């Protein structure tokens, strides 16, 4: 079952570098002119998991870029920045496929922030794997041109995948495999964060710290000496010393991918790559 709300259409601006005469380039750099807005098209983007921690921020950032945003979630709750909200239960695969195909009609990109953590392996495998496979296949069937997915940094399963949360990592792998099977490398972006922080509240499930605390932690763990130590440390220690990533940077990377600002990149793995990718906006 799903409930649809009408979608309003707004133009979504993408960007490209400005071509400058050779003699004027240094002056343009000195002025630090903003990137020019170009290729203005009416662009619909659907965010699955749009009411969640990451998804809600993706919706807001897309709206800032002028996109017509549809949020899909189990509850169908309205989300700031989304011009429509649709309720879809991904656990009911048959009805979800039909609902998603309708929701994805006319969309330029689908962003999946769907993920489940803190339950048993079977539920985590389904919530991260099966649910996303349904989303990917529905996007392909609807003729969506680009797909963005929030997965997990490769360093995390490499360290703890055989010890805990096996179903979580298996599900993430299922989702990534489905994306690669249905979309070409220049049609998708997989964003792979480790520990995401942000917001105003602490949480245990999923584990999360506030923006203030996370910014301070990122400043320490992102310093040169700590990064150098982490690079030489064995897996568990390296993961402990890994710099966390702000939810705003994760959302920014998703939006850059959704708008096709990829420069040929299809996998954005870890905090450094995510921060650099988010700066494309």
Could you tell me what each predicted segment is?
Residues 67-74:
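Conserved glycine-rich Rossmann-like NAD(P)H-binding loop of the short-chain dehydrogenase/reductase
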Residues 1-28:
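N-terminal chloroplast transit peptides
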């Amino acid at each position: 079952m799903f409930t649809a709300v009408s979608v309003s259409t707004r133009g979504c601006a993408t960007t490209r570098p400005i071509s400058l005469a050779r003699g004027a380039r240094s002056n343009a750099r000195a002025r630090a002119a903003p990137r020019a807005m170009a290729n203005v098209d009416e662009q619909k983007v659907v965010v699955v998991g749009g009411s969640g921690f990451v998804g809600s921020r993706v919706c807001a950032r897309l709206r800032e870029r002028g996109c017509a945003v549809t949020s899909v979630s189990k509850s169908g709750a309205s989300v700031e920045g989304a011009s429509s909200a649709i309720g879809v239960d991904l656990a009911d695969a048959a009805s979800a496929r039909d609902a998603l195909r309708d929701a994805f009609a006319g969309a330029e990109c689908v962003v999946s922030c769907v993920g489940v953590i803190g339950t048993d392996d079977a539920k985590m495998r389904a919530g991260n794997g099966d649910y996303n496979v349904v989303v990917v296949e529905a996007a392909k069937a609807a003729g969506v041109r680009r797909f963005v997915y929030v997965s997990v940094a490769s360093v995390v399963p490499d360290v703890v995948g055989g010890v805990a949360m096996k179903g979580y990592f298996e599900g993430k792998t299922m989702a990534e495999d489905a994306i690669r099977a249905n979309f070409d490398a220049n049609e998708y972006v997989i964003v792979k964060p480790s520990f995401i922080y942000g917001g105003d509240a602490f949480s245990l499930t999923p584990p999360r710290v506030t923006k203030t605390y996370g910014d301070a932690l990122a400043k320490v763990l992102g310093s040169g000496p700590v990064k150098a130590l982490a690079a030489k440390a064995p897996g568990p220690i390296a993961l402990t010393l890994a710099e966390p990533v702000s939810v705003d940077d994760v959302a920014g990377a998703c939006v850059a991918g959704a708008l096709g600002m990829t420069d040929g990149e299809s996998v954005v793995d870890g905090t450094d790559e995510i921060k650099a990718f988010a700066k494309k906006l």
